[in-house]
Every structure is written in structure tokens, then in C-alpha cells.
Amino acid sequence: MTYFIDVPTMSDLVHDIGVAPFIGELAAALRDDFKRWQAFDKSARVASHSEVGVIELMPVADKSRYAFKYVNGHPANTARNLHTVMAFGVLADVDSGYPVLLSELTIATALRTAATSLMAAQALARPNARKMALIGNGAQSEFQALAFHKHLGIEEIVAYDTDPLATAKLIANLKEYSGLTIRRASSVAEAVKGVDIITTVTADKAYATIITPDMLEPGMHLNAVGGDCPGKTELHADVLRNARVFVEYEPQTRIEGEIQQLPADFPVVDLWRVLRGETEGRQSDSQVTVFDSVGFALEDYTVLRYVLQQAEKRGMGTKIDLVPWVEDDPKDLFSHTRGRAGKRRIRRVA
């Protein structure tokens, strides 16, 4: 049978582990998987674009497990009281093709995105970084803030969003963390002045130039998260030209990332090579580094495996007959049309 993790179960799982420990453990798992980069069968995500958003499938596999994520991006959804990003994913056994996990990934995507940002910053930011600007205070902002506060030593966050209510929500959600100071800014320029790290996590599908070259200061690390599809950017092109730029999966980032603005031969560095020690990350304390983060399927593979391990360990989730299993005659599919006496087979793990 297939493990099934719905939103309430994922919520319970994250609460049981703790948001910050979840992100920290996941960042370590991501680092391990990025270090075995060449073991994976990789491809860019398959995207279906419309005027109002995008729907994507993100596949990846190694020799034992295949994973994919279904995810959307619809920036105007909040006006209809809907989420901008929603996702679910599957982890399957390569030997048999059977799905071993069907899971919600909306909550988990925010966690894995924060964990990926953390993993990159641990490798690229200056070790004495203590102050971060957080531009875009929507659904993913708290996860990014906690990742950098709990695991990188960020003590002060200067927050800015075009919607003041989003910033108020961020501050309210994180008020219990006494070691973290969150201050409002009235503009992007005010938010980024004097910080060590800039995290941009905005949602508008537009060629935006939220961060401009005049805002850069020596030694900054930029964690550019929001630009993740064609026609959607956050950084002025000259910001990239004045920085050392790191990417997840270059063929995908060339299409969807900040570097879509630049020629195809603009030099970038594979993050996995830095993590493996094959190439340099930050080359000096004064260098500006950019993590051009678009989100890659390997990160979803990692979070699906982590969720399955943690759910099994805690006896959480349900098991469902998503496909016919071993007790059925594999040559008699027609028997499944007889209704099985109307019984729906869903079994709570614990």
C-alpha cells in the first residue's frame, strides 16, 4: 500500500519535529543528495504557462527512487482567498514502479525552499553574517527567517513588503523568538542598507528589478528565491554582472532564473560542485555572491524521502490502495470493476 500524507498530517509532523529542526535536518539531507549529484537522472521541469500563472511537473530519479512534484504558481490567487503556490508529490520504487508515498507538498515546499536557501548560505555567505533583509513577506517568509535565524546566526531581520499586512503577519508569527529582532522598512532601499544577506521572495510574475546595483555593498550574499519562471525576475541584470552567481540545475536556471536576462554564456557556478569541494564558493570577504534559486526537483526528492522516514518513525499518516497491490491477481484487472463490496481500503498507520 501507499503511504498518504495529507495537510493535517503534515501539519502534525512539522509540529512534532519543530519547524527549525525540520529545516536544519532537511538542509543536511539536501547537502548529502547534492553531493551525489551525478547519481540522479535530471531534467528541467515541464511547465504549462498561462496569462495568470503556471502549472509544473518536476521529475527526478536515482537508481532506487523516482520522485515528482506537481506545483502551481498563481500570484493573483490571494485576491480569491486561494494560495499562490500549492503542491503535492509522489515517491516511487524504481524496481517495481509502485508508488510508496503520496504527500502534500505545499507546506513541505516552503520548508525545503528554506532549507535549500540555508544550505546555499552556509556555503556562500560570510560566516559572521548577522543581519538580513527580507523582501517579500508572504507565505514563505517565516520559513526563510527561521532558517537563517536558527541555523546561520541571523539576529536582525529588516522586512519589507508592498502589503503592510504581510509584514504584520510575519512579525506576529515570529514574536515568540526572543533572540530575533524584526524591524519594518518603508522601502527596499531602506531594508537592504547595511545588511549581510538579502533574501528576495516575491510573487509577482513580472520582469522586476527589486534589487539594483546601487544597493549592493561589499560582501553581501543575495538569496534570490522569487524569480522562478520565464518573465519573472527580482534582480537588475547589473547586480548579476557584479557578483559571483551560483545555480542549482543550470539548464533550468537559464530559462527560469535571474540569469534569463543575460547571454547564454554568462558564467555561473554549480552549487553542487561547491558542496563537493570541487570548486570555490565565496572567493573573498568583499565579494558579492548570488544564489539564483529557482527550485529543482532533487530538492523535492529529498523532502519526500525525509517526510516518509519521519512519518514511518512516528507512525503518522495513512496507507491507501492508490494502485492494485500484491494480494491482487496482476493479470485480472477487470475484477476491480466489481466494487469489492463497496469497501474503501484506507488504513491509519497508528
From Swiss-Prot:
| Residues binding L-ornithine, per UniProt | 45, 69, 112, 228, 294
- Show the catalytic activity: L-ornithine = L-proline + NH4(+)
The UniProt annotation places NAD(+) binding at 84, 112, 139-140, 161, 202, 225-228, 232, 293, 331
Q: In which pathway does it act?
A: Amino-acid biosynthesis; L-proline biosynthesis; L-proline from L-ornithine: step 1/1
Q: Name one GO biological process term.
A: L-proline biosynthetic process
According to the UniProt entry, its GO molecular function terms are: nucleotide binding; ornithine cyclodeaminase activity
Q: Does the keyword section mention Zinc-finger?
A: no
Please give the InterPro entries that the UniProt record associates with this protein.
NAD(P)-bd_dom_sf, ODC_Mu_crystall, ODC_N
Which EC numbers characterise this protein's activity in its record?
4.3.1.12
Q: What does this protein do?
A: Catalyzes the conversion of L-ornithine into L-proline with release of ammonia. Is likely involved in the L-ornithine degradation pathway that allows P.putida to utilize this compound as sole carbon and nitrogen source.
Task: Fetch the NCBIfam families from UniProt.
Answer: PRK07589.1
Write out the similarity annotation: Belongs to the ornithine cyclodeaminase/mu-crystallin family.
The molecule here is called Ornithine cyclodeaminase
Which source organism? Pseudomonas putida (strain ATCC 47054 / DSM 6125 / CFBP 8728 / NCIMB 11950 / KT2440)
